[in-house]
Curated annotation (Swiss-Prot):
Source lineage: Eukaryota, Viridiplantae, Streptophyta, Embryophyta, Tracheophyta
Cellular localisation: Golgi apparatus, Golgi stack membrane
GO CC, any one term: Golgi cisterna membrane
Sequence ranges of Low complexity compositional bias: 25-34
Transmembrane region(s): 40-60
Name of the coding gene: FUT12
Gene3D superfamilies, A to Z: Glycosyl transferase family 10, C-terminal domain (3.40.50.11660)
Identification of the protein by name: Putative fucosyltransferase-like protein
Lumenal side: 61-513
Superkingdom of this protein's organism: Eukaryota
The species this protein was found in: Arabidopsis thaliana
Location, primary (coarse class): Golgi
Coiled-coil ranges (or none): none
Amino acid sequence: MGVFSNLRGPRAGATHDEFPATNGSPSSSSSPSSSIKRKLSNLLPLCVALVVIAEIGFLGRLDKVALVDTLTDFFTQSPSLSQSPPARSDRKKIGLFTDRSCEEWLMREDSVTYSRDFTKDPIFISGGEKDFQWCSVDCTFGDSSGKTPDAAFGLGQKPGTLSIIRSMESAQYYPENDLAQARRRGYDIVMTTSLSSDVPVGYFSWAEYDIMSPVQPKTERAIAAAFISNCGARNFRLQALEALMKTNIKIDSYGGCHRNRDGKVDKVEALKRYKFSLAFENTNEEDYVTEKFFQSLVAGSVPVVVGPPNIEEFAPASDSFLHIKTMEDVEPVAKRMKYLAANPAAYNQTLRWKYEGPSDSFKALVDMAAVHSSCRLCIFLATRVREQEEESPNFKKRPCKCSRGGSDTVYHVFVRERGRFEMESVFLRGKSVTQEALESAVLAKFKSLKHEAVWKKERPGNLKGDKELKIHRIYPLGLTQRQALYNFKFEGNSSLSSHIQNNPCAKFEVVFV
């Protein structure tokens, strides 16, 4: 009959010893055995419940939350113990179906021990040198010494080793640096000045350039200085220099092209004395912004740019530079230079960022270099190793979300700061999966960890700010920095919700400013 056959109490016409009754039903007031029988009958469901719970605990088939659910369902369905189940509000009071218990369960069920421990088996890159002091993932560079590298510089690598190209030169001079061409040639990892490359290697950094150094008096009679030595550049910079000179703008030229001043000077110190600096690149290529531009910022000399079409993305403020996009722009730019040179108040506005601080967008860009490109390469490779393991059919199946009864769903996502390797757990409620809720949850998580932004030790003192974290961008892990900083955004909360639902245990990166 099964273990639950007697939950309904004694059958009519039988004593508790199961002998047929004679002379009708015995009187309850005159039969002690009937009283004992009723008490035992009431206790029987409790005994059965304890047996069931013991079995469940022994087999380890249910987690703590499921065990509570089973117990609740059993008691609420047994009329001898509870005739009416507790209301949902009461369940919350006694700890049932809570978000907290879901989070604890997800932390346990979603935890993973990866097969490769990078502290014991670091990322290994053949060639190059370890030119950083610290990295959030263990990584070594050098000769192979019998070990198969994770990656190596150059083509022709053995199976299992990814090939890397790294260069800070323009793709117009070195076509192999073009992202599409590098892929066609067989490079797995591209490291160039392009923010669309796998691991960008830009000219900018807080460590190399004292960008926030104070502005010095402009003492030179000429209002602009030029340092141009390659007179055969693949753009119109030489023509632009000549055209500016023809507009009666006095320019001191220290380079090999139209030199009229001795070039044996400290470039940055010389630029500090001029109101304008001709930051003319040798090619007009997206993201190709060299020291010419950043040295101008250090000097507090307004850069006049010939170069990348997206130079505004590299500027500390929208009015901090002048841009000659084509030869047609020379005349209006010259007119603007003359106006600013003659109006101190207007000119000072172009350097306002030196006193008030650059834009968050500029800080987010330069902060990327707070982690050395070689370390970012190691993080890129280690992330790839883990992603490949996660895609394996033998990888642990994780729930990544939790709902108890009719309560709201709790989603488990993972977030790390750009420039770091390990992920942190963040939980979102299904009814409030919004961008605002995601930012709030991420801030709360990292604040609870007393997290220090990766750029904290690199920025100049007046830009380090207080201990409060501010989010500039949150984006799905795996985007390029061009996508992350400029192109990507969720198209509303429904887009974010769909991403989380379609990507169990979704991973994100956050950029703090």
